Amino acid sequence: MADHDLVLKCWGAVEADYAANGGEVLNRLFKEYPDTLKLFPKFSGISQGDLAGSPAVAAHGATVLKKLGELLKAKGDHAALLKPLANTHANIHKVALNNFRLITEVLVKVMAEKAGLDAAGQGALRRVMDAVIGDIDGYYKEIGFAG
């Protein structure tokens, strides 16, 4: 619970512009981990140079951050939010668990820069995401997805 609160202290800066911050997160993810772009077939027609300014990338990034905000605000009581997300990410998108770890590291960096997330908050975000990823892993196992 305390970890969620540490992260939520800075969440207002993220909420203030979900599209810009979400676009930043996804673009950094694609730049730092180019293989992750393959998980987003709807961006396949966008050249690497045009990804940064793409409204589609920003919109999807906003969706990601809004869902993360819901998970943070649930403060660990997130089964109703997380189970359907795990289901779609396993059955439709085929997202391996490691990709959630990769985006976590990008989130930590972006929140440090854009929202003032300090070292304690960064550790808190990593711990929260570790718990979320652990729960996703449990759901993946339930449905037989080797993520």
Swiss-Prot record:
Subunit relationships: Monomeric.
Residues annotated for O2 binding in this entry: H60
One example GO MF annotation: heme binding
Protein family according to the UniProt entry: Belongs to the globin family.
Reactions the enzyme catalyzes: Fe(III)-heme b-[protein] + nitric oxide + H2O = Fe(II)-heme b-[protein] + nitrite + 2 H(+); H2O2 + AH2 = A + 2 H2O
Domain Globin positions: 2-141
Keyword terms of this UniProt record: Cytoplasm, Heme, Iron, Metal-binding, Muscle protein, Oxidoreductase, Oxygen transport, Transport
Protein name: Myoglobin
Cited Gene3D superfamilies: 6.10.140.2100, 6.10.140.2110
Residues that coordinate or bind heme b: H89
Cited function: Monomeric heme protein which primary function is to store oxygen and facilitate its diffusion within muscle tissues. Reversibly binds oxygen through a pentacoordinated heme iron and enables its timely and efficient release as needed during periods of heightened demand. Depending on the oxidative conditions of tissues and cells, and in addition to its ability to bind oxygen, it also has a nitrite reductase activity whereby it regulates the production of bioactive nitric oxide.
Organism: Danio rerio (Zebrafish)
One GO-annotated biological process of the protein: digestive tract development
Keyword field contains Heme: yes
The keyword Iron belongs to this UniProt entry's keyword annotation: yes
The encoding gene: mb
Annotated positions binding nitrite: H60
Any Pfam family: Globin
GO cellular component assignments: sarcoplasm
InterPro entries: Globin, Globin-like_sf, Myoglobin
EC number(s) stated in the UniProt entry for this protein: 1.7.-.-, 1.11.1.-
